[in-house]
Amino acid sequence: MEIFRGCTRGCRFCQAGMITRPVRERSITTVGQMVRDGLEFSGYSEVGLLSLSSADHTEIGDMCSGLAEQYAGTNVSLSLPSTRVDAFNIELAQELSKNGRRTGLTFAPEGGSERIRRVINKMVSEEDLINTVVTAYTNGWRQVKLYFMCGLPTEEDEDVLQIARLAHEVIKAGRAATGSKDIRCTVSIGGFVPKAHTPFQWAKMDRPEVIDHRLRLLKQAINSDRSLGRAIGYRYHDGEPS
């Protein structure tokens, strides 16, 4: 269920965020009616609240609270498939898990190092990410997905290796916060492709062999600590298709 269009964040690689402005939000009333109709006519029991960054909706807390109350005691679950690291909080986590069904949570730091995140204008700190995943883990989630990009402008090997270090820190923080070793995260890597109408539209792409080299380095770095590496899933696209 699309709850709004547009984005004001201005990530330099994101075409959708540039060409779908201005932000246009659906009201809580409209969303509630569309959810009711969708559940009635589709037969599905999971409601995904979609947008470029669903937690940025100005009424997302009240929206999730209202839907959670409306479908309390049923098998209907709520999810936010696309969530900004700095917009997710404990209140939102509690609303999403009210019925006891915790669907997937995906966060997109995009870059492994703070330097590369500044380059792409993704102003998310490591502290923000750790605090966010700890909030998820302590509210009952046992797995989160982290999305990154490889081949970004000015990227070096070290920027990619920082993805592995960040994933290790996520697992360590989750285990420390919950006292459980049943904590997992999936690292998903997509290749950077310049898009028209973005600040990076004329940026060159790295050669496929460079991308593949960095993906191999990342896999080795994730598995360099076997205790942590076993808790981290790793998904990526080869350099050539990108």
What are these regions (language model features)?
Residues M1-R12, L39, L80-P81, G104, ...:
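N-terminal pre-triad scaffold of radical SAM enzymes
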Residues G17-R21, G112-E114, G151-L152, P194-H197:
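A short, flexible beta-alpha/helix-coil linker loop
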Residues M18-T20, V119-V124, Q201-R207:
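Short glycine-enriched, charge-decorated loop/helix-capping segments at active-site entrances
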Residues S27, S125, E156-D159, R207-I211:
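Residue-level preference for long, well-ordered alpha-helices that form the structural scaffold
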Residues R36-T186:
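Conserved SAM/AdoMet-binding glycine-rich loop
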Residues E40, Y137, V160-S242:
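Auxiliary Fe-S-binding modules of radical SAM enzymes
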